[in-house]
Amino acid sequence: MSSSNENAKAQAPEKSDFTRRCSLLSRYLKEKGSFGNIDLGLYRKPDSSLALPGKFDPPGKQNAMHKAGHSKGEPSTSSGGKVKDVADLSESQPGSSQLTIFFGGKVLVYNEFPVDKAKEIMEVAKQAKPVTEINIQTPINDENNNNKSSMVLPDLNEPTDNNHLTKEQQQQQEQNQIVERIARRASLHRFFAKRKDRAVARAPYQVNQNAGHHRYPPKPEIVTGQPLEAGQSSQRPPDNAIGQTMAHIKSDGDKDDIMKIEEGQSSKDLDLRL
């Protein structure tokens, strides 16, 4: 037994520093209930846009406030209750906002203007009479109107009197008219020449200018009973030529018959004489 106790005593001081520190930390938390002023970087920094008290405070600070509240005897409230209290306070206090007024062609801006006074101003503005529109004409518009009224447009339908014109002016007008006529004629000639060239270029075949005076070569005469020579056309002769050839053939046959009859008569006469 004595040997076992000695072994236990020898093994007791062999505990690591980590276990000792953990045991000490647990005792400290049981006694204090928080880490105190020790910052371990485990909390989030408070957001600047939401400045609500107690929402993003360090855990040590929250516990300290919680204990202080209990010590004074105040009832403990949750985070939702605190938000409601802050909202009630903001509603109870009279609000102030920015006020913008358009008056007399100017813009007036007031910062932190109370709401009650703004409502009073709106009521006074409603009771006031509406402002009549004032027609303000600038001097530039007046000058333009005067210039328009002074301008007189001539009537083009009325004939112009040449009696008031001097001789030099009349001669100048006549020369201008002659020049204009010559220019018009020249432009017309150029236009017709271009039109003619375009028509010739677009035509599918070459236009023969002497088409009305064209003379066709004479047709060759057809002679019956002669063979066709080289280079002559073998076209069919007309019906009149065929009739003439047939009549000519018939006349030749009749002549042969007449000759035969005459020969027969002459032979009979010789027989009778003998």
Curated annotation (Swiss-Prot):
Any GO BP annotation: defense response
Motif (Nuclear localization signal): 183-190
Top-rank lineage group of the source organism: Eukaryota
Keyword Transcription: yes
InterPro entries linked to this entry: CCT_CS, TIFY/JAZ, Tify_dom
A Pfam family hit: tify
Entry's induction text: (Microbial infection) Triggered to degradation by the pathogenic Pseudomonas syringae HopZ1a protein in a COI1-dependent manner, thereby activating host jasmonate signaling.
Chain residue ranges for the region called Disordered: 49-95, 139-176, 206-274
Keyword tRNA processing in annotation: no
Domain spans labelled Tify: 92-127
Modifications after synthesis and translation: (Microbial infection) Acetylated by Pseudomonas syringae HopZ1a.
GO cellular component, one term: nucleus
Bias kind Basic and acidic residues: ranges: 249-274
Cellular location(s): Nucleus
Coiled coil (residue ranges): 161-185
Key words, A-Z: Acetylation, Coiled coil, Jasmonic acid signaling pathway, Nucleus, Plant defense, Transcription, Transcription regulation, Ubl conjugation
Ranges of biased composition (kind: Polar residues): 139-150
Role, per record: Repressor of jasmonate responses.
Oligomeric form and interacting partners: Homo- and heterodimer. Interacts with MYC2, MYC3, MYC4, AFPH2/NINJA, TIFY10A/JAZ1, TIFY10B/JAZ2, TIFY11B/JAZ6, TIFY5A/JAZ8 and TIFY3B/JAZ12. (Microbial infection) Interacts with the pathogenic Pseudomonas syringae HopZ1a protein.
Domain note: The jas domain (182-206) is required for interaction with COI1 and Pseudomonas syringae HopZ1a.
Family designation: Belongs to the TIFY/JAZ family.
Protein name: Protein TIFY 11A
Organism: Arabidopsis thaliana (Mouse-ear cress)
Name of the coding gene: TIFY11A
